[in-house]
From Swiss-Prot:
Function: Subunit b, of the mitochondrial membrane ATP synthase complex (F(1)F(0) ATP synthase or Complex V) that produces ATP from ADP in the presence of a proton gradient across the membrane which is generated by electron transport complexes of the respiratory chain. ATP synthase complex consist of a soluble F(1) head domain - the catalytic core - and a membrane F(1) domain - the membrane proton channel. These two domains are linked by a central stalk rotating inside the F(1) region and a stationary peripheral stalk.
Coiled coil segments of this chain: none
Keywords: Acetylation, CF(0), Hydrogen ion transport, Ion transport, Membrane, Mitochondrion, Mitochondrion inner membrane, Transit peptide, Transport
Transit peptide feature, positions: 1-42
Primary site of residence: mitochondrion
Keyword rRNA processing found: no
Organism: Bos taurus
Molecular function in Gene Ontology: proton transmembrane transporter activity
N6-acetyllysine: residues bearing it: 139, 154, 162, 221, 233, 244
GO cellular component, one term: proton-transporting ATP synthase complex
Official protein name in the record: ATP synthase peripheral stalk subunit b, mitochondrial
Superkingdom in the source lineage: Eukaryota
Modified positions (N6-succinyllysine) in chain numbering: 131
Length: 256
């Protein structure tokens, strides 16, 4: 629990530590020293989310697991007790009033940790989850933005790959425009030629009609000129006789 609190406090204080006057040059110098090479492209192993197990709030579990095959289950405790007694018997460590103060302080801290550690840990975990959620949201937004950029780039590449279709369409449009112009000119020529042929046909028909009229008038005039007065009288008399005969036949027929 204390490790989570320390990590959270360190993360919150990191920007201020970078700008600190005393630690800034040292940190920058260390950065210059340890980050002069090329970055490694090897995959970075994921950091553990939770710390390892400890006993008595201080001694790691790996220490006991290391001594179990050699000393048995009680070996680490016997070793610790013997080490404490050795330090006291040889007066390497002398018990003073400060020792009782330290024991009281440690006991009070242990009590605080046992009583409020879980709630403080949950609060720290909640803060970390909120920060992780914010970072995840920023990450997803960045991923979406990058994906949109990738999709746009793919669409642009697809348009570039299909630009020959555009050239083909333009080429076909130009060919169609040329074909339409050619057809229009051809139709204009056809209309002009037809008009001229119609004119010549009209002229020929008119000349033929005039020739026929002139021939008829000439023949009629010659026929009239060739008839004598005696022939005219005989023809008129014959016509009158024919009319009288026709009238008599009409009167002789019974009325139905």
């Amino acid at each position: 629990m204390l490790s989570r609190v320390v990590l959270s406090a360190a993360a919150a204080a990191a920007p201020s530590l970078k700008n600190a006057a005393l630690l800034g040059p040292g940190v920058l110098q260390a950065t210059r020293i340890f980050h002069t090479g090329q970055p490694s492209l090897a995959p970075v192993p994921p950091l553990p989310e939770h710390g390892g197990k400890v006993r008595f709030g201080l001694i790691p579990e790996e220490f006991f697991q290391f001594l179990y095959p050699k000393t048995g289950v009680t070996g680490p405790y016997v070793l610790g007790t013997g080490l404490i007694l050795y330090l006291l018997s040889k007066e390497i460590y002398v018990i003073t009033p400060e020792t009782f103060s330290a024991i009281s302080t440690i006991g009070f801290l242990v009590y605080i940790v046992k009583k409020y550690g879980a709630s403080v840990g949950e609060f720290a975990d909640k803060l970390n989850e909120q920060k992780i959620a914010q970072l995840e949201e920023v990450k997803q937004a960045s991923i979406k933005q990058i994906q949109d950029a990738i999709d746009m780039e793919k669409s642009q590449q697809a348009l570039v790959q299909k630009r020959h279709y555009l050239f083909d369409v333009q080429r076909n449009n130009i060919a169609m425009a040329l074909e339409v112009t050619y057809r229009e000119r051809l139709h204009r020529v056809y209309r002009e030629v037809k008009n001229r042929l119609d004119y010549h046909i009209s002229v020929q028909n008119m000349m033929r009609q005039k020739e026929q009229e002139h021939m008829i008038n000439w023949v009629e005039k010659r026929v009239v000129q060739s008839i004598s007065a005696q022939q005219e009288k005989e023809t008129i008399a014959k016509c009158i006789a024919d009319l009288k005969l026709l009238s008599k036949k009409a009167q002789a027929q019974p009325v139905m």
